[in-house]
Swiss-Prot record:
This is 3-methyl-2-oxobutanoate hydroxymethyltransferase. InterPro entries: Pantoate_hydroxy_MeTrfase, Pyrv/PenolPyrv_kinase-like_dom, Pyrv_kinase-like_dom_sf. SUPFAM superfamilies: Phosphoenolpyruvate/pyruvate domain. The gene is panB. It comes from Hyperthermus butylicus (strain DSM 5456 / JCM 9403 / PLM1-5). It comes from the Archaea.
């Protein structure tokens, strides 16, 4: 999307109408948000994936609403042009629509422009309640990581016709409930293409093929920071190797006395060191 004005929900919806591909990437902190925004992404997802790639947790289940608030606020401080979408973490919207609205409101207050929930038609009441409260919603169908235990692990969605129809129904229901976009995760590409054709709102794929209106990747996968990235992620740079090399060089410089070098440290004003020495000697002589 051209220009430097703030990207809005309307801009995202219009991008599909214009045939413009939507670029989405995750960010969880101020510096990363600034960098990806300067690179020209359209949407920044503050994903609950931060649990694994930032906090070292075993899954998204341990991510709290407070975690999401803190990282959303950090991203928002970068004042990105991109639209900020914050994930609603596990059990922050499932119990009741009231909980969903109150918790989503906290993420909006933290700086999100929209929230994402895992689900579509099955959470139509929740989506409607959020939209009614003035909170833009991105739905999420196909593989839904928050329900990986129920699904029996991280499995490709839509492998059979009956499974595919269920994913399609979820996506259609999300649009009918008022979602302005749908993320389709790790789903058979034919199913993602059918959903994209059927919906008037944008579809954003992750591991679901090239026929969606946009794509999203976890920034750590994109930059080569993840030890075991998913098979659908493309590593655009081996930043892990670059970081290891840089820190190794720094450690070597410290141990060999090469860091800090000239121009990286400063002294006292002329004559002040001599005064300091006299003061130190006087103090030593007084026995204090």
């Amino acid at each position: 999307m051209a220009g430097r004005e703030k990207v809005t929900v309307r801009d995202i919806v219009r991008a599909k109408q214009r045939g413009e591909r939507i670029v989405m990437v995750t960010a969880y902190d101020y510096i990363t948000a600034k960098l990806v925004d300067e690179a020209g992404v359209d949407m920044i997802l503050v994903g609950d994936s931060l649990g694994m790639v930032v906090l070292g947790l075993p899954s998204t289940h341990q991510v709290t609403l407070e975690d999401m608030e803190r990282h959303t606020a950090a991203v928002a401080r970068a004042q990105p042009r991109a639209l900020i979408v914050a994930d609603m973490p596990f059990m922050s919207y499932e119990a009741s629509t009231r909980d969903a609205v109150l918790n989503a409101g906290r993420l909006i207050a933290a700086g999100a422009d929209a929230v994402k929930i895992e689900g579509g038609a099955s959470y139509s009441d929740t989506i409607r309640a959020l939209v009614r409260a003035g909170i833009p919603v991105v739905a999420h169908v196909g593989l839904t990581p928050q329900r990986y235990k129920l699904l029996g692990g991280y499995r490709l969605a839509g492998k059979t016709a009956s499974e595919a129809m269920e994913v399609i129904r979820e996506a259609i229901g999300a649009e009918e409930a008022g979602a302005f976009a749908v993320v389709i995760e790790f789903t058979a590409w034919e199913v993602a293409r059918e959903i994209t054709r059927k919906l008037s709102i944008p579809t954003i794929c992750i591991g679901s093929g090239p026929y969606c209106d946009g794509q999203v990747l976890v920034i750590h996968d994109l930059l080569g920071l993840t030890p075991t990235p998913p098979p659908f992620a493309k590593k655009y740079v081996d930043l892990a190797a670059i970081i290891r090399r840089a820190v190794s060089e720094y450690a070597s410089d410290v141990r060999n006395g090469r860091f800090p070098g000239e121009g990286m440290y400063w002294g006292m004003k002329r004559g002040e060191y001599e005064k300091l020495q006299r003061l130190i000697n006087e103090q030593a002589g007084s026995g204090d």
